[in-house]
Swiss-Prot record:
Residues 1377-1399 are annotated as: Disordered. Interacts (via protein kinase 2 domain) with BCHC1 (via PH-BEACH domain). It is an enzyme of class 2 (transferase). This is Protein GFS12. It comes from Arabidopsis thaliana (Mouse-ear cress). One of its GO terms (biological process) is protein targeting to vacuole. One of its GO terms (molecular function) is protein kinase activity. PROSITE patterns: BEACH (PS50197), PROTEIN_KINASE_TYR (PS00109), WD_REPEATS_1 (PS00678), WD_REPEATS_2 (PS50082), WD_REPEATS_REGION (PS50294).
Amino acid sequence: MRGEDSDLCFDCLDQRINSDFSDQIVFSYGVSDSPLPFGSSAVVKVSDSSEEFSASCSSCESTSSQFILEYLRKDEHGCLAKYVDKFVVKDREGNSNDAVESDECLDCSTSGSQATEDDDTENITCGSVTCEHSGSFSCWRTVAALLPIAQIRKCSASELQKLASSFHYECPEDQILASLHRLIDGKSSGQATHSFLCLLLGLPLLEEKSKLRCLRHPNLSPVLGLLTSSDCLVSVLPKAPYTLENILYYSPSAIKSEWHRNFIIYQLLSALAHLHGLKVSHGDIRPSNILLSDSLWSWLTIYSKPDLGSVDANSSASRRRWCVEGCYSYGLYADLKISSHLDWQTHFDKWWKGELSNFEYLLVLNKLAGRRWGDHTFHPVMPWVIDFSKKPENDSDSGWRDLRKSKWRLAKGDEQLDFTYSTFEFPHHVSDECLSELAVCSYKARRLPLSVLRKAVRSVYEPNEYPSDMQRLYDWTPDECIPEFYCDPRIFCSLHPSMSDLAVPPWASSPDEFIRLHRDALESPHVSSLIHHWIDITFGYKMSGHAAITAKNVMLSSSEPTVPRSVGRRQLFFRPHPVRLGFSREKEQSRNELEMHTFHGFGVDNKRSVILLADEYLEETEEASAFSDHATHLCPKYHLRENLVESPLHVSYSENTKKVNTSLPGTSKNKGLSSRISLNYLLEHMEVRDEASTELQELLQWRQDFCTGNISKDIAGDIFSIGCVLAELYLMKPLFNSVSLATYLEGGDLPELIKELPPPTQVIVEACIEQDWRRRPSAKSLLDSPYFSATVRSAHLFAAPLQLLAKGQTRLCYAASFAKQGVLKVMGTFVAEMCAVYCLPLVTTPLSEDECELAYVLLKEFTKSLTPMAVQRLVLPSIQKILLTTGYSHLKVSLLQDSFVRELWNQIGKRVYLEMIHPLVISNLYNSPDKISASAASVLLIGSSEELGAPVTVHQTILPLISYFGKGICTDGIDVLVRIGRLLGVNFIVKQMLPLLEHVVCFCIDLSSMKKPEPVHSWCSLALSDCLITLDGLVALISDELLIHELTKGRLCLHVRVLMQKNLELRVLQFAATSLMSICQRIGQEMTALHVLPQLKELFDEFAFSEKSTDASDSLSWKIRTAEQKFHPESPIKSRMDLVLLLYPSFASLLGMEKLRQGCPTWLLLEQYLLKHHNWKWEYTGRSSRYNMEARPVLKQGPASKHTPKVLLNGSGRSVPQSQGLRNSNHLKLHIHVPVEGQEAVLNPLVHEPWSWFPSPVTCWDGLDIGRFGNPKDENRWKIRASVLSSARAHHGALRSLVVSEDECTVFTSGIDPGFKGSVQKWELASLSCVSSYHAHEEVVNDIGILSSTGKVASCDGTIHVWNSQTGKLISLFSESPSDQDQASSDPSSKNNSNPCNRHASHGLSSGIFDENLYTCMHYLEYMDQLIVGTGFGALRFIDLARGQKLELWGGEAIESGFTSLVSALCSGGSQTKHGDGASVSPSWIAAGFSSGQCRLFDLRENGFISSWRAHDGYVTKLVAPESHLLVSSSLDKTLRIWDLRKSWTPQPFVVKGHNDGVSGFSIWGKDVISISRNNIGIFSLAKSQDEEEQQQQRIIPQKLYMAEKGGRVKSDLSTICVLPFSRLFIVGAHDGHLRICC
């Protein structure tokens, strides 16, 4: 740790950076270990407007332009300074100091510089008499090994910008990864690759006498450069987003598991093994020095201390010597007594005794909470102690701010905070930050650059909007104060001419006086007697638990606790903070002392100390001591020495140095040393075999056997620090504090906390912190210990190369090539999942064609290698981003191929595909999509429609595409609709598609006749065009007989209805006329005259009588035009009257003039008009007239396709459908699909088509959706008609349970069969027929569940049968024995589980369960592949399905009578919950309902009991968790109840009544809940239960189910219900054994 005396104040540091680098380098904030704004490091932003730099930033993993500059005084870093000066001299002599560009230059003769032939780096030393480096590891050689990529440059802005550009664009370690990629591909690789792999594997170099390779270990922070000035060196490092300290303080859940903890430690040990191999100790390992990336990859920092070899390292230079002369900040903080060398306990004791001011103590607390000076997002916070209403006086409460309440509470009021807490989704009173960036920048507005104000406050700078005086500033914000208002008068003075100075209160004459009075107020007796309350609210126990609720201080919690955070609120204390000694108001009043005197200085008033009673003083002392002992975690210790002044370059030899091999240490457990590391060698090291958890005995044997005596005391100190960090990762608090460390060193007594560690971790930690440093293991020995599993080693070896500073393309090549060689399969699914976070971000960046192929390979390999849940959580978000890209993307087209999608289906199932991918496939067919992407998407949709089934296809493909009519749907989108019609058959076209299209046409016609804005009318015309094109394509597929039948249904021909409209665009009318003639020619002369011509009479009459209004000049122009050019029916018409020219001559040719004149009374007027304007005259020649307007569509000629869409989709190639024509704004060409070769042009209707029972959804479809602009994914509420579409007799007795497969094509039912035995039947919904049965049950089956996409089914009849639904063979059988009940007593949730059960707690749904040892219900945990089953004695049994064995038993629920009740319902929270990206998350809790009406909540992750409450007055029939915080329950007490678990673990329900009988079950679709009671169904909305909090009840209106065809009611009682969300259907089972499909 750098001493404060060698630090700059942040003002001087800012000025120094500006002086060295100009204003192109923006100072963000300083970095310091001190509570005061002094330090030698700063976070800066490097600005560069060059296009190359901007483009490079976008292609790099880290797009941030922030870097850390650390100033190192040359007189404190002598070795490093001489090393740098050597290359500065060489640079002057003409030698290049650019970064290396080839493997052959990667040696330690230069720090990234090419060596000259006469360099003798083996014997180079720095020349310092005190330098202890010697031998093969010389001082300069060690520096080069630690800084292999650092470029040495002059200190200037341009050089720093070059370093930044090199980091983002040139990527100095790209060559190493490229060489490794060549090795994986079986090509020749350089020596650097071998050296790098030896570095990771811990192997010695092949030639020990060769020059040491200059390679950075991936877990050491990269020093990009060393910039030199006259007196300083400036090291340049990329800024890491987090430190381990950040994670432990603000987002501990980001370290998700024990594996992640061990992985972090393994990385640190790997870096230490490299350092120790160089005979270098780190010396300062602590969480704040461990940097983490977004993916939690670790970097260990180096070079943060002066070295021992410098002549002035031990001299004490004053702070004034390095700051500028007359530094203002030095005067501000000169009298403060705090120091970074003192721990919290010392500062607390000084403050409590009055030796430290309130201001100083609060600064210490800010530092402990992680707050940073100058960082506007996380600035130190101070309390407002006065309200500025008047000048405060010590003898009055007037003018003082109430420190017992938060500023947020004072500003908002209790009523508003109570409302916020009770109504918001995440209950809270206050924000998650007591001092926002907006408030800080507003406070400091006079001193900050305008660019900062525009970014943080408002983009448009308005100086008058900023508070002008302190009173307004205080009233304006609910945030707390900043330290500057207590110490720095400059904050009032404006640097901006347009903004006035901040006015001080009237009782202060100047800013200086205000600062003095404000500071005095902070130190006054009034504040000293109350400041502990503010500490409790801001840093203490009132931040959580019941105390936070009482104080109205519940903070807004993070919605994603597993996401790493670098800022947040840290709770320092967990019990009330003691009042300052002598300032207790209660004791002051009890003693009846004199009124308070004015407080002088920072000490305690002598008069007050005299009158303190001895017992009261002792009581306060004991209270403070107990508080201090309880907060020892604020004094962490990670080292055995207090003052660490040695350099990391300090040589660390053991007593047996001469006996130690100076090369990098090898390992005894390596699988042999290969003379050449090959791909097979790497795969062998990465292979993960099935292994059990670490055995404690094996670890104990390792500790006894590991080699000792080859490490130095300094290196052993690093191992001690590693042990402390490992323990803290598990304990979430430091292992040692100052007291416990002293006790341990003195007597060897280990801290009590160590007993809380898992036994294997405890063994490792005890070995690392061994009191005798000679007995501590080396880093290499720890890496090879059995503590680290093969999964950790494999993941590190695979991921480490990806952390090199290489280009995204190179990293992608490495990952894809390695994955293609089978590394993911070799590593196993778990390691592949852990490594996905390092690989998948590479595929979502802009890629070239070649890179797209690599990205496709990588996605495909991860899809095959990961578990379904992992694919859903990790791979699908990347696929979603790719499918959402606009324009052409080679990768997107690849992902839309059938081979990939089917593989995805097999992994994640169709339900997840339909939720997360299918809507994005459809989105590629509208809004001017790329033609190739649209073609690929259309082929995919066509081929998937048959497998998805008619109901899903209609609701998830056809309706969304129709909703895009008029909104930019492309030709391929319409082609999808037509080809799906061809694929699913003529009955599907007639029954499903034609009614939908008719609905669209009628809706558009009705809308066009209304007075609407122009965009609406324009949309109507576009939608009609799309609809008519689709209609024509479908009509071409049906027979003439069916076509005539559709025309003779009594409905007006749609085309004629369109032609009758006067508000539609002419191109729509022209297309309708052309289409109508095509239909007429198909049905023939007689049918046209019989059915079509009468409907045209009104239209012809309109044309005849409107001819007189035609303008004469217009007629003349028409005559001239028609005389010069013959009119063609495809030529765009100019007016509505031109339809006469399209229709009348064509009908004359088709019907003959005589029949036409008979059907058209106004024939004379029309023929006169045609003769006059178009020179048309009927001439009978036995054939058609010379102006025969034949409207038959011209079929697109070309080679016929040899494959049906199904074959096209299933192929491995990337076939796309041929275009069926183009549409544009001026001309609409009719699209009729050419029949596939070998098939008939028209489809013949089948008698027994699949899904024949499925009705048209048009009756449930809201036409208004068509005109609404928005995402069709945002569906409206389901309109349930309570109509039975089809039914079948499934069982002889009652149908007890049913479950539907995720593709909604198969349903399993269980019920009572003859002999009161149970059976399970498998039904295909397409034909509504039973295809197989399972009859191995001896009792009635009460519950069934589909376990996975592999076809396994579990069924419960008191025992659990797991069987294969394809073969019907039993896989596993599980049952409970009486002896198993004794296990439940060990469950943490059970107090007494040995009581007899209630054998009569059964009801109609569970008849047959009379034995307490029988299983009653079950719930599948997909994430864990486990089954939770309830028992008759109220316990929960876990079953591992993969291993086929029973796991733990959680105890049952005891009721007042001493009996237990059976478990009647189970569910888990989280498994159905989705992230914002749609990915499922693992369940975090389990809810169990009981026959007694009780409900219990269990913590699934911690294996503990959470809560229990009386949920119902009767048997709980079902539990469902629609969201992570919601629980819905039903009961035989006739109610359903909704429980919001966020507000309390014993929540108040939202009660839903209305049923007259017990609710036997329910099912949820979206926000709608469909419940069943007897023979009634009831519907209510979850949205109302959340939006209308004041309404405590919602009533259900029961409905009867009606038979769709017969119209009669369903009289049988309903027993179970299941919703088919994608099909918009639901299925009910009844006591009469029937299975009924309803809508």
